[in-house]
């Protein structure tokens, strides 16, 4: 037993010197030609599978593609590019890192105004909703560092309520348009109308992110009862000519003791920390810097913007153009003629240095299991769809194929 223990210690000591060479990555390194061949075959199978085709359709000889079909193809492609651009501009940092670092907290109180400015009389009788407006323009420059946003409002008891419980729903107010609804649903709650006061919280991260990206979209939030303009019997039937009113009361909005005090009452409201407010959790940029690089350099994203301009040896997205005719032998895809499918490649160094016990154990594991991957591998993180125009017989089709373009990579 003692001899086996001594042998194990000797092996671990020797592996201390070998860990440096083993700690880059155990993922198999392939040459470009082999990678392209594998990627081409994968794309061939992906496209046919996504189109539910067992074999490529017969190519159709077309002298020209109708304008309407080309317009549909171009508009679809542009819409996808726009959506990806907005997602990139408004996205947060990678989740694991953003969860780890401490957040700066910003509080924005509801903008106070006259009573009628915080009410929407949607129905002929009664008050069915409340509006809450906020100015968050001071943090617009740090919009990409938004981690989470919460809307908080204090429900206060309503002793004169005619019901014990009522359902409320929170909406983002949208700019009026005849083609879309004027509200976007965020969440709902069933609440007691009496009882003790309680704070209500709603996750409004996506809404606030949109406000920070486009200031003109900030039209406020609205709390409304579930079915305004109707009151229901216990069996679900509508009571005609009787309209439900909001009996849930909120601090800072329904304070009857402040009514009639004019500017003095509104000033008191502004200083009341129980008023409706937003809580924004922001990650300071310096906390996302790479601590190992002496300067204040922002951690780079391993995407096409960085990788295509730099000679990065470690994990990065690499350009790979697929020509439908030359690489796949396909003539049935009319648009595009080809596209950058890209791929991920490069070693992923361990997070810990090579002289730690952690790396030593992993090095031993790699030695005993050469086919396994104990260290991270370079894999796709963000993928974009591809829009194609093709014919089945003489019928044109425009299709969107999901996850066809590698835009960024990560070590996983």
Swiss-Prot record:
GO terms for molecular function: cytokine activity; growth factor activity; identical protein binding; transforming growth factor beta binding; type I transforming growth factor beta receptor binding; type II transforming growth factor beta receptor binding; type III transforming growth factor beta receptor binding. The modification N5-methylglutamine is found at residue 293. The keyword Transferase does not apply. Residues 1-23 form the signal peptide. Gene3D superfamilies: 2.60.120.970, Cystine-knot cytokines. Glycans are attached at residues 74, 135, 142. Transforming growth factor beta-3 proprotein: The precursor proprotein is cleaved in the Golgi apparatus to form Transforming growth factor beta-3 (TGF-beta-3) and Latency-associated peptide (LAP) chains, which remain non-covalently linked, rendering TGF-beta-3 inactive. A motif (Cell attachment site) lies at residues 261-263. The keyword Metal-binding does not apply. Transforming growth factor beta-3 proprotein: Precursor of the Latency-associated peptide (LAP) and Transforming growth factor beta-3 (TGF-beta-3) chains, which constitute the regulatory and active subunit of TGF-beta-3, respectively. It is linked to Arrhythmogenic right ventricular dysplasia, familial, 1: A congenital heart disease characterized by infiltration of adipose and fibrous tissue into the right ventricle and loss of myocardial cells, resulting in ventricular and supraventricular arrhythmias. Loeys-Dietz syndrome 5: A form of Loeys-Dietz syndrome, a syndrome with widespread systemic involvement characterized by arterial tortuosity and aneurysms, hypertelorism, and bifid uvula or cleft palate. LDS5 additional variable features include mitral valve disease, skeletal overgrowth, cervical spine instability, and clubfoot deformity. LDS5 patients do not manifest remarkable aortic or arterial tortuosity, and there is no strong evidence for early aortic dissection. Belongs to the TGF-beta family. This is Transforming growth factor beta-3 proprotein. The lineage of its organism: Eukaryota, Metazoa, Chordata, Craniata, Vertebrata.
């Amino acid at each position: 037993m003692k001899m086996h223990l001594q042998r194990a210690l000797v092996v671990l000591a020797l592996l201390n010197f070998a860990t440096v060479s083993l700690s880059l990555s155990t993922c198999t390194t392939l040459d470009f030609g082999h990678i392209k061949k594998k990627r081409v075959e994968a794309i061939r199978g992906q496209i046919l599978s996504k189109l539910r085709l067992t074999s490529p359709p017969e190519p159709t000889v077309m002298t020209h593609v109708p304008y309407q079909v080309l317009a549909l193809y171009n508009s679809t492609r542009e819409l996808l590019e726009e959506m990806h651009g907005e997602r990139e501009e408004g996205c947060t940092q990678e989740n694991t890192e953003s969860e780890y670092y401490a957040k700066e907290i910003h509080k924005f109180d509801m903008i106070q105004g006259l009573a009628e400015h915080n009410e929407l009389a949607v129905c002929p009788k009664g008050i069915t909703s409340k509006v809450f407006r906020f100015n968050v323009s001071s943090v617009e420059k740090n919009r990409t560092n938004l981690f989470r946003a919460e809307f908080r409002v204090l429900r206060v008891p309503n002793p004169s309520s005619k019901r014990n419980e009522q359902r409320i729903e929170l909406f983002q107010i949208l700019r009026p348009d005849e083609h879309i609804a004027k509200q976007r649903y965020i969440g709902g709650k069933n609440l007691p109308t009496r009882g003790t006061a309680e704070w209500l919280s709603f996750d409004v991260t996506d809404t606030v992110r949109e406000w920070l990206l486009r200031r003109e979209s900030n039209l406020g939030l609205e709390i409304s009862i579930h079915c305004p303009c109707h009151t229901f019997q216990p069996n679900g039937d509508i009571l005609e000519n009787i309209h439900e009113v909001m009996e849930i009361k909120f601090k800072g909005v329904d304070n009857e003791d402040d009514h009639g005090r004019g500017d003095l009452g509104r000033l008191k409201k502004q200083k009341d920390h129980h008023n409706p407010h937003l809580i924004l959790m922001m990650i300071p940029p310096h906390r996302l810097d790479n601590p190992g690089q002496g300067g204040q350099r922002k951690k780079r994203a391993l995407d096409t913007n960085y990788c295509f301009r730099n000679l990065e040896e470690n994990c990065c997205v690499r350009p790979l153009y697929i020509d439908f005719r030359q690489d796949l032998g396909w003539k049935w895809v009319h648009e595009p003629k080809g596209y950058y499918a890209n791929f991920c490649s490069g070693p992923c160094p361990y997070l810990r240095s090579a002289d730690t016990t952690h790396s030593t154990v992993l090095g031993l594991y790699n030695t005993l299991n050469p086919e396994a991957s104990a260290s991270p591998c370079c894999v796709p993180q963000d993928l974009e769809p591809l829009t194609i125009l093709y014919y089945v017989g003489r019928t044109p089709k425009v299709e969107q194929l999901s996850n066809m373009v590698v835009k960024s990579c990560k070590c996983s």
